[in-house]
Amino acid sequence: MKNVLMIHLFWAVLGLLLLIGCGQLEEPIEEPTAVPPTPLSQISPTPPPSPTNTAVPTATATPTMTATATATATPTATPTDTPTPTPTPIRFAVIGDYGLVGQPARDVSDLVKSWQPDFIITTGDNNYPDGEAATIDENIGQYYHEFIYPYRGTFGEGADINRFFPALGNHDYSPTDGFQPYLNYFDLPGNGRYYDFVWGPIHFFALNSDWREPDGHHQNSVQAAWLRDGLAASTAPWQLVYMHVPPYSSGLHGSAAVMQWPYAEWGASVVLAGHDHTYERLIIDDLPYFVIGLSGHPARYWLVDEVDGSQIFFNQDYGAMLVEATETEMFFQFITRAGEVVDTYRLSQP
């Protein structure tokens, strides 16, 4: 009997060992539950940092000066229907030989507009090559329409008063239509070919130095008599005369004897011209003369024959003149399109 019990015990132990060896009595291990990945479209992006010290644009100041230009059949010795703007000081730009589509003209116009001048005067050659109606808006209005009133072109809005006062140049004469495209495009005082206006402390006289001027361009002409009488009658602190062909120049075209009128004797304070594609300042008989002809035409001229009295001659880059004036001072600067101040000159009342 004892032997039978031992045999049963042996087989029971053996079965238990087999079960343990096969792993059937091992405690089950719980597998972690898999978490599906979040789709990229549902991940909220990290918000960008809020900008700091953001510059707030400042509104451009609107010029307060006013000058109206009413065309008349013939110019008068003093401006008509041209109210004198106040107050002073005033700030204006001078450009010359600029009227040709291209990068130099674009650069100079950007420079001039960055000054926020009250108005612009030009020393001629506004519309290369031949003063035609077909090219006048792209050569002028494209760059300066904001200053022209009334503006009849296609490049944007014009000014609410006229702030653009050109002088006629030889390239503003059309072989077929004469000065008419120019006269149709602008609404200027007087007969439009030569005229005057007062702005702040300055009485401006724009001349037509072209030989095709009906009233002549020599010292004994109708035009010269008009200037002489106008200068004599002027009561402004300053009298500024401007034209295209220079009375004195050291550049390629040189001095034009026919325009060497007695400006100082007649009462002019300063004389501006263009024609030579240079910048030059001269003092002749104690009167300052400037040549401003680097405002857009790609050709730049060289020094040919230095005139006695020449103070500075420059032809290395394109640019324009900035003038600031009060009743007692006029301050002239010629500045290149790169912002280089080439020359400064100050006039003071005695």
Functional labels for PLM-detected ranges:
Residues 2-10:
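Bacterial N-terminal signal peptides that target proteins for export
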Residues 19-21:
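C-terminal motif of bacterial Sec signal peptides marking the signal peptidase cleavage site
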Residues 26-88, 350:
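Ser/Thr-rich, Proline-interspersed low-complexity disordered segments
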Residues 31, 86, 312-350:
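A short C-terminal boundary segment appended to hydrolase-like catalytic domains
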Residues 83-139, 229, 249-250:
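N-terminal active-site segment of His-dependent metallophosphoesterases
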Residues 97, 124-125, 169-170, 207, ...:
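Active-site glycine-centered loops adjacent to acidic/histidine catalytic or metal-binding residues
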Residues 113, 132-238, 256-270, 276-326:
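Extended active-site neighborhood of metal-dependent phosphoesterases/phosphodiesterases
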Residues 234-250:
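Short acidic, glycine-rich surface-loop motifs adjacent to enzyme active sites
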